[in-house]
């Protein structure tokens, strides 16, 4: 079973992540940031991963450290759950609409953490979540997981835009991590 647990504790945050890549989309998320809980629940549901996240951060300052460290911890857990990456598809993509918004996410489980993020949000916050942290979450997750992630979001409602992106990320990662019995290591180099 492809699963992992990561615990990260700093002076700013205390985070535990448990993930099973071959799950059913069940989740228990408690980050202290209501909108982020909703997004990570959508990510798990559409990515068919079982996910538990318990996070405490210095939210009295702002949401930066908490969102960043959740991205780092989730990325580490995802990387650990994949293990040596033998027999995975490697590439995945998804186009997800949500009313007027459209999110396009493409991923490569390459071992090279990198992100490209294109979106223009209209509001600085959605509830208690800073929209600018969406880009930072993707970058932190990508670098920590060793996954290249390209994101492009269009739309008018920031909530719809961010939610479509989290759903698309879940779908794209599910596709890329899918097992393919015909594959060994999906690289001409022989390593990822």
Curated annotation (Swiss-Prot):
EC number, UniProt record: 4.2.1.19
Pfam families documented for this protein: IGPD (PF00475)
Principal location listed in the UniProt entry: cytoplasm
Catalytic reaction(s) noted: D-erythro-1-(imidazol-4-yl)glycerol 3-phosphate = 3-(imidazol-4-yl)-2-oxopropyl phosphate + H2O
InterPro entries referenced in this protein's UniProt entry, alphabetically: IGPD_sf (IPR038494), ImidazoleglycerolP_deHydtase (IPR000807), ImidazoleglycerP_deHydtase_CS (IPR020565), Ribosomal_Su5_D2-typ_SF (IPR020568)
Pathway: Amino-acid biosynthesis; L-histidine biosynthesis; L-histidine from 5-phospho-alpha-D-ribose 1-diphosphate: step 6/9
Protein name: Imidazoleglycerol-phosphate dehydratase
GO cellular component: cytoplasm
NCBIfam families named in the record: PRK00951.2-1, PRK00951.2-4
Compartments (UniProt record): Cytoplasm
Keywords: Amino-acid biosynthesis, Cytoplasm, Histidine biosynthesis, Lyase
Domain of life from the UniProt record: Archaea
GO biological-process terms attached to the record: L-histidine biosynthetic process
HAMAP family per record: HisB
Gene3D superfamilies membership: Imidazole glycerol phosphate dehydratase, domain 1
Family the entry assigns: Belongs to the imidazoleglycerol-phosphate dehydratase family.
Any one GO molecular function term: imidazoleglycerol-phosphate dehydratase activity
């Amino acid at each position: 079973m492809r699963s992992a647990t990561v615990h990260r504790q700093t002076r700013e945050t205390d985070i535990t992540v448990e993930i099973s890549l071959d799950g059913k989309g069940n989740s228990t998320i408690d980050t202290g940031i209501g909108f982020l809980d909703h997004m990570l629940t959508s990510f798990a549901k559409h990515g068919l991963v079982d996910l538990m996240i318990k996070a405490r951060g210095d939210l009295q300052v702002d949401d930066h450290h908490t969102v960043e460290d959740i991205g780092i911890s989730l990325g580490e857990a995802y990387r650990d759950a994949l293990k040596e990456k033998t027999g995975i598809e490697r590439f995945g993509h998804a186009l997800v609409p949500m009313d007027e918004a459209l999110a396009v996410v493409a991923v490569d489980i390459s071992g090279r953490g990198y992100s490209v993020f294109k979106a223009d949000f209209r509001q600085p916050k959605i509830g208690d979540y800073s929209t600018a942290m969406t880009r930072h979450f993707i970058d932190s997750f990508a670098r920590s997981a060793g996954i290249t992630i390209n994101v492009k979001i269009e739309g008018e409602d920031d909530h719809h835009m961010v939610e479509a992106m989290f759903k698309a990320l879940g779908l794209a990662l599910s596709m890329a991590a899918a097992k393919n019995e015909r594959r060994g290591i999906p690289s001409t180099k022989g390593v990822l």
